[in-house]
Amino acid sequence: MTRSVWKGPFVDGYLLKKAEAAQSSGRKDVIKTWSRRSTIMPQFVGLTFGVHNGHKHVPVLISEDMVGMKLGEFAPTRFFPGHAADKKAKRK
């Protein structure tokens, strides 16, 4: 179920402050965040966020195509190593 239009997009307040500070100073540091639920805003374009995936911070460079999506969509939380190979086929 999507968010109501009248409510507007959700972004953590501290994340907006950090993004504005990074834009005004022109620094290209990674902005670490645990807020996977925050919506990507147009003023985030060009910034790099370190989005936490439960294990580490995954660097995500924001592009114009990402605006309106959530930060957590770009930092997968699950690792799938693949299915086990058939041992009989390996021997031959």
Curated annotation (Swiss-Prot):
Q: Does the keyword Ribonucleoprotein apply?
A: yes
Give the encoding gene's name.
Answer: rpsS
> What Gene Ontology molecular function terms does this protein carry?
rRNA binding; structural constituent of ribosome
Q: Cite a single Pfam family from the UniProt record.
A: Ribosomal_S19
Function, as annotated, reads: Protein S19 forms a complex with S13 that binds strongly to the 16S ribosomal RNA.
The keyword Methyltransferase is assigned to this record: no
What InterPro entries is this protein classified in? Ribosomal_uS19, Ribosomal_uS19_bac-type, Ribosomal_uS19_CS, Ribosomal_uS19_SF
Can you tell which superkingdom this protein's organism belongs to?
Answer: Bacteria
**One of the protein's GO biological processes:** ribosomal small subunit assembly
Q: Which GO terms describe its cellular component?
A: cytoplasm; small ribosomal subunit
Protein known as: Small ribosomal subunit protein uS19
Q: What family, per the record?
A: Belongs to the universal ribosomal protein uS19 family.
User: What keywords does the record list, in alphabetical order?
Assistant: Ribonucleoprotein, Ribosomal protein, RNA-binding, rRNA-binding
Q: Which residues form a coiled coil?
A: none
